[in-house]
Amino acid sequence: MVETTTMMKVLVRVREFDVEKDLPAVEELERRCQVGLSGDMAAVHDHADDGDGAAAKEKKKTKTKTKKKKASMSLCVEQIGDPLARVRHAPEHVMLVAEYGEEEEKKKVVGVIKACVKTVSRGGKQEKPFVKVANLLGLRVSPSHRRLGIGTALVRRAEEWCVARGAEHATMATTESNAASLALFTGRFGYAPFRRPEFIGHPVHAHRLPVARGHRVFQLPPEVAAAAYARLLPPQDAEFLPADMPALLAHKLTLGTFVAVAADGASFAVLSVWDSTRSLSLRVSGAPALLRASLAALRALDRGAPWLHLPSIPDIFRPFGAYLLYGLRMSGPDGPALLRSLCHHAHNVARKNPACAVVAADISPDDPAAAAVPRWRRFCCDEDVWCIKNLNPDEHDADDWAAPPPPPGRHLFVDPREF
């Protein structure tokens, strides 16, 4: 699959990713376009362009505002390992690259985008409980080749690929501060802001966190966990619940599904743990030297006097990994306390992995479970914006899925495989 476009008298060729030929160039592009989960990093390293200058204007405005503010800490994420890890779980997935240049020996990869078509729940009383939805992610354009329409060409070709495979809607995610990305998708391509999940993280301490007395925690086998989630998260009550939920729960990177129950049996909580340390590397940047020194001193003191149980945290200013919590549900008067105990249990599991420094969840802020998840402000981000587009505008849609907000009681499921 190849699409050739002439831009500013230079040939731009969009084609499928060739792992043997393109892997080094794509890895270098990812490093140059490092993405922040929050703060100014996302605005400075915006990774999209709209091809007609609108993004450039927004970018200039963002930079002007950024200069007036003091440098702040940002949580940055970099994909490691398999470049297709975030889409490979879908039966239909692709990675497209944009080549810039005319002469074969001088061509270089200047853009990349990933796309997949998956079957997920839409929520509500629909004729079909599951629909085919495309997910566009990982759009990167080389900083030295922006404002040339390369991002536009990549998105357009990715949408065409998804439509050809029966996708009814397309989704993408960015951050509120990434004005260029929002301008590209909501302006040129007609996406509408849709949902605002919140990233909630907590550092992994050197010491175990307590599980409340009277709370029993046990692990469910994958087949039992699938049956439990089928009752707790029916398709009509959840958005983006994957049709292959049993496969997700049985995946080798799902470390387990855990349930906590109270002594009286009137309340319970459940969550699953996903190991992302093999595919994602996070790092906190922009921290003051004094803070770095203080946390280093605290770690040294904790190593020398572990009986003090000081709340020391790993070195988060170097690349580290994370465990992701998904499928968080609770019920009963003691549900929040039980869910908090499960989060502590997940933290204690993470302590056994030296590569894991954070336990986190991506969850809708209006979900009651969000209030029960332990958080550290520096590891939280409420800037995420999900956008959606109907890929079949000619078909009448009586229930506009993009119309905000979702009805009360509808849960947003965030697939950890695509984080």
From Swiss-Prot:
Write the record's keywords in alphabetical order, separated by commas: Acyltransferase, Nucleus, Transferase, Ubl conjugation
Q: What is its EC number?
A: 2.3.1.-
Residue ranges of the region described as Disordered: 44-68
Q: Where is the composition biased (Basic residues)?
A: 58-68
Free-text tissue specificity from the UniProt record: Expressed in roots, leaf blades, leaf sheaths, shoot apical meristem and young panicles.
Q: Which family is annotated?
A: Belongs to the acetyltransferase family.
| Role | Possesses intrinsic histone acetyltransferase activity and acts as a positive regulator of grain weight, hull size, yield, and plant biomass. Regulates postitively grain weight and yield by enlarging spikelet hulls via increasing cell number and accelerating grain filling. Involved in the regulation of plastochron (the time interval between leaf initiation event).
Q: What else is known?
A: Over-expression of GWA6A enhances grain weight and yield by enlarging spikelet hulls via increasing cell number and accelerating grain filling, and increases global acetylation levels of histone H4.
Q: How does it assemble?
A: Interacts (via C-terminus) with HDR3 (via N-terminus).
What name does this protein carry?
Acetyl transferase GW6a
